[in-house]
Amino acid sequence: MFRYLNNEERANTWTHLIAVAATLAIAWPLLRLAHTAQLDQPDYQLLGTALFIAGMLLMFLSSTLYHAITEPMHKARLRIFDHIAIYVMIAGSYSLICVSVVGGWIGWTLFIFLWACVLAGVIGKIIALGRHPRLSLALYLAMGWVALLILWPMWQNMPHAAFWWVVAEGVFYTIGAYFFNKDEEHAYYHAVWHVFIVLGAASHTIATWLLLS
């Protein structure tokens, strides 16, 4: 499959294929940790962790397939699925924090809001067929930085090391957005965007591990 790809698409494919393998490697240990962890509001900690892992795996796998496939019709469909998966990843990342760290009406309201954004993003992608990538980027960033609304309860209820890893995650994604926005103008900028996505996901994985430990 890869022999038909140009060098940029090879880079785009490999950056997230490696991330797929890493996600599969960490999934079971993280789920086991979630099963035994004792958070202040533990009832939904396994659900929140599972949603994060599922979102991360879906995002990296759909991205890998999109960049690896060369057949135009399949590639167009996978592009839409790739963008939808990012919505799922963002909502999945905050699910554990919303339901097990923040909790209460604030946490659950934010949880519902984020997954409503996923639904809106899915509908928008299907209707618009992925014609507005910059609008999607704006929604990605808005969903990601909605954590600003819960910074104080996060700081109060999370280990501070985990908190700063979540901050680092947001910084990585925001820097990466610059390269995504310029990827049609510069070679390999999309692969650089992928690297920042991996760094952001890794930061959140570390934060989750510290939170559950």
Question: Which residues fall in each region the model found?
Answer:
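Multi-pass alpha-helical transmembrane bundles in non-GPCR membrane proteins
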Residues: 1-213
